């Protein structure tokens, strides 16, 4: 590596506060199987910068400045047609996407900020008539995500839908996209659920929805447990596949030791948010 390249990496590291964004990630559905999907999710997790781990779980950065805040995912459908998705590396939130020469962004301040750094060469920019909030997306789609099948075939359909603008259809497609990428990166269980749906679609399990609604709460309690002998200050109630409520009270739970893969930094969690937030993707602002 040349001294110029080394210097460039050092400058980037300083700019990002000591952490380097590792680059874009890609996933092709043509020929995809559970293994290749698992590698994609692993690549997505590895591309998210962090400085420390809490109970061996990567803690996402509280903030990143400029273009380094955004990771690009290149997703190809079965026909090889592609969209590029912009992801905020501090929370794994999807900000918008590029289809052909048109960029699309959620109608919210965070996405508007992202539009200043990604897809700048797009010939046309469209602001979607909704935010990335789960509740808003479900209203726009006309159905809750509990009734929208997910799987790799559904991801193919979502990509194909997003290639052409239809705000109602796009809302449902984005619900599929969020769960098969961002949520799968956050939780090993959700990744495995999608792997089981590599060749067929099925609605999300009750446990999947419960985990999606509880990521911020779990993240918060796991971080607080560091100063409380591993005990959660506020228990998190999850729902299993059979609809049974399960109380998580400490870091020895399997949800902590082998399921959750990324932690949202407490500096990005709304005060009073202890989980069970059914209307959001992660927490209250998305």
Curated annotation (Swiss-Prot):
<feature type="signal peptide">
    <location>
        <begin position="1"/>
        <end position="23"/>
    </location>
</feature>
<keyword id="KW-0325">Glycoprotein</keyword>
<dbReference type="InterPro" id="IPR016138">
    <property type="entry name" value="Ribosome_inactivat_prot_sub1"/>
</dbReference>
<comment type="similarity">
    <text>Belongs to the ribosome-inactivating protein family. Type 1 RIP subfamily.</text>
</comment>
<dbReference type="Pfam" id="PF00161">
    <property type="entry name" value="RIP"/>
</dbReference>
<feature type="active site">
    <location>
        <position position="183"/>
    </location>
</feature>
<dbReference type="InterPro" id="IPR017988">
    <property type="entry name" value="Ribosome_inactivat_prot_CS"/>
</dbReference>
<dbReference type="GO" id="GO:0090729">
    <property type="term" value="F:toxin activity"/>
</dbReference>
<keyword id="KW-0611">Plant defense</keyword>
<keyword id="KW-0732">Signal</keyword>
<protein>
    <recommendedName>
        <fullName>Ribosome-inactivating protein momordin I</fullName>
        <ecNumber>3.2.2.22</ecNumber>
    </recommendedName>
</protein>
<dbReference type="GO" id="GO:0017148">
    <property type="term" value="P:negative regulation of translation"/>
</dbReference>
<dbReference type="InterPro" id="IPR001574">
    <property type="entry name" value="Ribosome_inactivat_prot"/>
</dbReference>
<keyword id="KW-0378">Hydrolase</keyword>
<keyword id="KW-0652">Protein synthesis inhibitor</keyword>
<dbReference type="GO" id="GO:0006952">
    <property type="term" value="P:defense response"/>
</dbReference>
<keyword id="KW-0800">Toxin</keyword>
<dbReference type="InterPro" id="IPR036041">
    <property type="entry name" value="Ribosome-inact_prot_sf"/>
</dbReference>
<feature type="propeptide" description="Removed in mature form">
    <location>
        <begin position="270"/>
        <end position="286"/>
    </location>
</feature>
<dbReference type="InterPro" id="IPR017989">
    <property type="entry name" value="Ribosome_inactivat_1/2"/>
</dbReference>
<dbReference type="InterPro" id="IPR016139">
    <property type="entry name" value="Ribosome_inactivat_prot_sub2"/>
</dbReference>
<feature type="glycosylation site" description="N-linked (GlcNAc...) asparagine">
    <location>
        <position position="250"/>
    </location>
</feature>
<dbReference type="GO" id="GO:0030598">
    <property type="term" value="F:rRNA N-glycosylase activity"/>
</dbReference>
